[in-house]
Amino acid sequence: TAPHIDALKKATPKGSAAHPYNLANQTNGGAKVENTANCYVVNAPGYYSFPMVYGNAIKNGATNTSAYKTKATGTVLNTLYNHFGPITDPYITNNANCNIKSAELVWQDAKNLITDIRYVDKGMNGGYVSFKVSKSTIRPGNAVIAVKRPEGTILWSWHIWVTHDDLYKTTEITNAKGKKFNVSPLNLGWCGGDIYYYRSRSCLVKFTAGGESKIMTVRQLPARFQPGYSPYYQYGRKDPFQPSDGTNAIKTWYNKDGVPSTAYPTVKNLGSGDNLIKNCILNPNTFASSNDNKYLNLWSINNGRPGINTPVVKTIYDPCPVGFKIPEGDAFTGFSQENSTWNSEFAEKHFYT
């Protein structure tokens, strides 16, 4: 097996079936909910769980109201929505019409990467979802898990990212204005593929000009190449879409029944405004074709005007794991000669990787 897969298989397993490792407890995986997110990172085999909390609505063990409420003015949604209406509490089951019955896989891009998914209605605040990552099948990959009401309505969904890489070995970058940012070494959801090694080679080349000749040695240095992939994101949404396989095609993914597919996500008009937000939550694997940009604060709660690089305050729709957030709009301006943002069109449909 490849080194990146070996590293995952050899990692010390976490949790047990009776006591799964709580991904929202960064101290020791215990029962206390410390920090939540829409994306949880797994780097070892084992049994895992996460609480029924909207995105990052719990921070440092307390309610993080700024993740879903704002008094900002402009083109903003002052209280962010769940599938039904404005959120009133960080814990899903403490909101109206949010009784959870089950949990299931939406998709995963590695066969049997995540198994034994179940909803456990235990303890306070709506219990938790647990799942297993087996040593025999662990490898870099992505999965989306959703919880449902009794009639099958999706209430919320989370991204599980399995990787051996250390996301917290950040790189410091500086934008055009001299502001510094610490960024992850990987795109969100990045998974490396098989590693290819190329040995050093050399050959003799003879040059002849007129009556003179000269033989030169051309040497090619050894090289290491690792292709990979990462999922795609639609503006303002928390859930990833299946990645490309490196060509103009979708990487093979598997549904809840283990059936493989290379089909693109469903594309559908999911409405506009408040209805668009609710329908995106209800349909995490449907790409919204409706060209609606009514609210500018879906990924930064206080952002009320286009083209203004206000400090990002992470929201419950942010797709990043604990410790990270969507960067400010001018974070990468130091990379371009013009020192401008990559796209300033207000009505564009954007993909993010």
Language-model region placement:
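A short beta-turn/strand-edge loop motif at beta-sheet boundaries
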Residues: 57-58
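Terminal domain-start segments
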Residues: 65-68, 81
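Conserved positions within compact, well-structured domain cores
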Residues: 4-27, 36, 44, 73-135, ...
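Short acidic/polar inter-strand loop motif in beta-rich domains
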Residues: 151-155
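Generic detection of short hydrophobic beta-strand segments and adjacent strand-loop junctions
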Residues: 42, 48-52, 160
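Structured alpha/beta or helical-core interaction and ligand-binding surfaces enriched in interleaved
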Residues: 36-37, 53
